[in-house]
């Protein structure tokens, strides 16, 4: 059995998957915020419960935001302060007496989709998350590409390309990102960025679901906004896809529920790619909230 943990600032979610990659059981508990000992106990107790329930010693994979293992073997995860700065992988491997694997949660999302029955035919899969921020991951032949700093797929921290400024106007404001840089594309393409663009052009403060509802009602202002957003997304993806050249692009995060993104993006991409380039197949993520657990569990399928 494959145990996959999706760990965030508020919850520790465990999913147990069988050899056919089907979810058999899941459980969630609150994430301890201050005590590392309590954090380790929470994970180990869930593993013990799963072992007892299924009568096996399952493999353990963990997806967590941040950098799973720094040069000194410790975790960097600002959203999980109880474990940040601690040798999480080594400590859990010792306590559970098994190989524990860690990866960035965005990489786990991409891995989950790459191992979907429908998508395993594609050698190079790019996962793109359009949510609170913009992130993602790359999976080649069923294995995540992490890079030495676990930042492969941090697409949101690429800066706006020149073509974006041509589209939006050269007086378009370069917003400061939480990472400290100016003009990172997640400030414009995330769910919050989607809402910011609307406010910037129309001086109205609406959340993304409200804007999308107006678009669905045929509101001209909302339709113009969505057109602008999709063109900006295509421009930015043109640069990324020219570098990565994936077979499949899977889009997740809150904005993936907006069908116009997956249905209208493909027709806009070719004008931003090399003439010889083939645009990837574009699909909405299949596994929703379970994606993090799935991808973490499947870290043990990558040998």
UniProtKB/Swiss-Prot annotation:
Q: Which domain of life is it from?
A: Bacteria
Q: Does the keyword Transcription apply?
A: no
Give the reactions, separated by semicolons, that this protein catalyses: N-acetyl-D-glucosamine + ATP = N-acetyl-D-glucosamine 6-phosphate + ADP + H(+)
Q: Pathway listed for it?
A: Cell wall biogenesis; peptidoglycan recycling
Q: Which UniProt keywords apply?
A: ATP-binding, Carbohydrate metabolism, Kinase, Metal-binding, Nucleotide-binding, Transferase, Zinc
GO terms assigned for molecular function: ATP binding; N-acetylglucosamine kinase activity; zinc ion binding
Q: What class of enzyme is it?
A: transferase
Entry-linked PROSITE patterns: ROK
Listed EC numbers: 2.7.1.59
Q: Which GO terms describe its biological process?
A: N-acetylglucosamine metabolic process; peptidoglycan turnover
Q: Where does ATP bind?
A: 4-11, 133-140
Q: Where does Zn(2+) bind?
A: 157, 177, 179, 184
The UniProt family comment states: Belongs to the ROK (NagC/XylR) family. NagK subfamily.
Q: Which NCBIfam families match?
A: PRK13310.1
Q: What does this protein do?
A: Catalyzes the phosphorylation of N-acetyl-D-glucosamine (GlcNAc) derived from cell-wall degradation, yielding GlcNAc-6-P.
Under what name is this protein listed?
Answer: N-acetyl-D-glucosamine kinase
Which organism's genome codes for this protein?
Answer: Salmonella paratyphi B (strain ATCC BAA-1250 / SPB7)
